Amino acid sequence: MQPAVLLGFLGATVVAAVSSMPVDNRNHNEEMVAHCIIEVLSNALSKSNAPPITPECRQVLKKGGKEVKDEEKGANENTRFEVRLLRDPADTSETQRPSGGREGAEAPSEDTQGPPGADVEGGGHSREGAGKPRGGPYSSDNPVAKEGKTRHSEKSEGQDREEEEGEKYQKRERGEEGSEERHLQEPGETQTAFLNQGNRATAKKKEEFESRYDAHSAGGPAKTHSRERSSQESGEETGSQDAAPGEPESPPEGQEAPEESQEDASLEVDKRRWRPRHHHGRSRPDRAPQEGSPPPEERGHPREESEESVLGLASPGGQRTRHPTHYPASEEEAEHGEEVRSSSSVQAPGDLVGARYGGRGGAEHRAARRPGEESPEQDRRVGASSELRNKGPGHSEESEEERGDEGQRHHRAWAGGPRADAPPDPAEEEQFWGEAHRPVPESQVDEARRHPQAKLRNYLNRGEENGEEGAPGRWQQPEDLQGPGEHAAEARLPGKPYAAHRIPEKKRLGELLNPYYVPPQWESSHFERKDNVGDNFLEGEDANGVTLNEKTFFPEYSYDWWEKKPFEEDVNWGYEERNLAPKLDLKRQYDRVAELDQLLHYRKKSAEFPDFYDSGEHLSPRHAAESEKERAGQGVLTEEEEKELENLAAMDLELQKIAEKFSGNRRG
């Protein structure tokens, strides 16, 4: 056991010496790494004569992977600091002048909160960002030297930790040697990947980064339109520089961490390069005091600079709302809410009007305008803009309340006479809210959508109103294509007499336009009136109001028509209507005669053969006696009665012939 411990100590000291030696032992270290790689590969390929893997090789392989990670991390940090040092001299002359007021305004919030940007982006590992002064880009200590010191201390701590791990590893080594030899292919492959690709990737990304920055810095001055845009760019870059140094301090969690940090840096440059910058020449004056202009007690600038800050020309604080990537902006806005309210109420009305009409005669408008002279159109515009501001997405409730109070104070400053910070008059406040909620005038499209027929009628009757009666070529009947309800609505208008010729015109149009239009044969005048219900409204119209004519809706019911209607569905309607009435009359007469003939024939037969036509009922003796008496009383038929019966029989035969004749014609 003691030789193993001594061997572990020896290996750890050798590894520490090799890693701590500078450039002189580099070749020896590379030879050791190559020898260890050969051993690992031969064991992985399970060669028979492969030498066993020594613990020194294991320590070298383990240390080599960490060295590659440290090298990539150091290269990444060096590229960041080099780019920053290259960028700082070009921007210092522009950032120092406009950022003075902003630093003074944000000093209290930064003292209370600490550096929020570095904490958020660095994920809590912001030792360098917290200890570094935020004033200018150049600090008293050299950041490269400080970074080198921190890296050296981290490396020494890592070596001590590795020595302890080496001792424990030597103790466990003998029991786990067989299982570990199978899995040693992965460290060998990662070592080769790091040696072959790591340095090339870092060098290549560094070159791309520097060339991209050179192209950006060369094309930047040509793209800037004015001093205002360059100041905006400098303000953005200083904000990103404050947040950037906190990122390299966080230790990498995996092997992709250095590459991800390099990609983040390149993405930041691309975002700064291609980010759209809106509102170059102007900004909204009612939002400018809230966005970034410091209060009057903190800014020591003359009146011209205050006007520029209202217009949004040189205040870098206005970039908070434009670039939502700076997260601490909403917190700072919430802290400065009271200062914003005080500064917005003190603002003079002339400055605001001049800012609104800055590019087109602002001074003349300010001179010509007097307090209390604002037109209703401007009031409406102010109310609509304040409502839109309050409804805008992406803002906190505090900022919306600030904007609402600010809009009220602006309104009082414009319309309220000499004292702009006076307490609000209730009459003025009522007038302001009435103007803000005044209904917007209806556009022509909405009006035409709601009143299309009235618009058409006005257009068609324009000539009659001007005195032209019956202009040639005009469409005289546009209402014929409208519904009956529109007729009624039109007739209730004064000066519109009822035209009686519209009914046939409408019918003719219906017959022409509808290919399936078949007028029914039983249509009467009542049904014609029913088709034009709206016209009947007009016929029954009195001075007191509209009275309905019940004939319009309830025509006279014809019972005969339902009796005449045939039961067969496939008959020809026109032929049946012409010939049905005489046949029915004849059939009724025939039925009556047939009934009479049948009765007489029955009486005659019953008289001749009384026993045959007997009902067959079993009569009681009393009833039988009565029937016999009746027969005796009746006696035999007289000659006159017999003649009548013969005549009736002849008539019956004739009627039967006539009926057969009619039925034959009907079948044929």
Curated annotation (Swiss-Prot):
<feature type="modified residue" description="Phosphothreonine">
    <location>
        <position position="79"/>
    </location>
</feature>
<feature type="modified residue" description="Phosphoserine">
    <location>
        <position position="179"/>
    </location>
</feature>
<feature type="region of interest" description="Disordered">
    <location>
        <begin position="611"/>
        <end position="643"/>
    </location>
</feature>
<keyword id="KW-0654">Proteoglycan</keyword>
<comment type="function">
    <text>Secretogranin-1 is a neuroendocrine secretory granule protein, which may be the precursor for other biologically active peptides.</text>
</comment>
<dbReference type="InterPro" id="IPR001819">
    <property type="entry name" value="Chromogranin_AB"/>
</dbReference>
<keyword id="KW-0165">Cleavage on pair of basic residues</keyword>
<feature type="compositionally biased region" description="Basic and acidic residues">
    <location>
        <begin position="167"/>
        <end position="186"/>
    </location>
</feature>
<feature type="compositionally biased region" description="Basic and acidic residues">
    <location>
        <begin position="64"/>
        <end position="90"/>
    </location>
</feature>
<feature type="modified residue" description="Phosphothreonine">
    <location>
        <position position="92"/>
    </location>
</feature>
<feature type="compositionally biased region" description="Basic and acidic residues">
    <location>
        <begin position="144"/>
        <end position="159"/>
    </location>
</feature>
<feature type="modified residue" description="Phosphoserine">
    <location>
        <position position="126"/>
    </location>
</feature>
<feature type="compositionally biased region" description="Polar residues">
    <location>
        <begin position="188"/>
        <end position="200"/>
    </location>
</feature>
<feature type="compositionally biased region" description="Basic and acidic residues">
    <location>
        <begin position="615"/>
        <end position="632"/>
    </location>
</feature>
<feature type="modified residue" description="Phosphoserine">
    <location>
        <position position="525"/>
    </location>
</feature>
<protein>
    <recommendedName>
        <fullName>Secretogranin-1</fullName>
    </recommendedName>
</protein>
<keyword id="KW-0964">Secreted</keyword>
<feature type="modified residue" description="Phosphoserine">
    <location>
        <position position="99"/>
    </location>
</feature>
<feature type="modified residue" description="Phosphoserine">
    <location>
        <position position="399"/>
    </location>
</feature>
<keyword id="KW-0765">Sulfation</keyword>
<dbReference type="GO" id="GO:0030141">
    <property type="term" value="C:secretory granule"/>
</dbReference>
<keyword id="KW-0732">Signal</keyword>
<feature type="modified residue" description="Phosphoserine">
    <location>
        <position position="606"/>
    </location>
</feature>
<feature type="modified residue" description="Phosphoserine">
    <location>
        <position position="615"/>
    </location>
</feature>
<feature type="signal peptide">
    <location>
        <begin position="1"/>
        <end position="20"/>
    </location>
</feature>
<dbReference type="Pfam" id="PF01271">
    <property type="entry name" value="Granin"/>
</dbReference>
<feature type="glycosylation site" description="O-linked (Xyl...) (chondroitin sulfate) serine">
    <location>
        <position position="234"/>
    </location>
</feature>
<feature type="modified residue" description="Phosphoserine">
    <location>
        <position position="620"/>
    </location>
</feature>
<feature type="compositionally biased region" description="Low complexity">
    <location>
        <begin position="237"/>
        <end position="255"/>
    </location>
</feature>
<feature type="glycosylation site" description="O-linked (Xyl...) (chondroitin sulfate) serine">
    <location>
        <position position="93"/>
    </location>
</feature>
<feature type="compositionally biased region" description="Basic residues">
    <location>
        <begin position="272"/>
        <end position="282"/>
    </location>
</feature>
<feature type="modified residue" description="Phosphoserine">
    <location>
        <position position="330"/>
    </location>
</feature>
<feature type="compositionally biased region" description="Basic and acidic residues">
    <location>
        <begin position="122"/>
        <end position="131"/>
    </location>
</feature>
<feature type="modified residue" description="Phosphoserine">
    <location>
        <position position="217"/>
    </location>
</feature>
<keyword id="KW-0325">Glycoprotein</keyword>
<keyword id="KW-0597">Phosphoprotein</keyword>
<feature type="modified residue" description="Phosphoserine">
    <location>
        <position position="93"/>
    </location>
</feature>
<feature type="compositionally biased region" description="Basic and acidic residues">
    <location>
        <begin position="435"/>
        <end position="450"/>
    </location>
</feature>
<dbReference type="GO" id="GO:0006887">
    <property type="term" value="P:exocytosis"/>
</dbReference>
<keyword id="KW-1015">Disulfide bond</keyword>
<feature type="compositionally biased region" description="Basic and acidic residues">
    <location>
        <begin position="204"/>
        <end position="215"/>
    </location>
</feature>
<feature type="region of interest" description="Disordered">
    <location>
        <begin position="64"/>
        <end position="498"/>
    </location>
</feature>
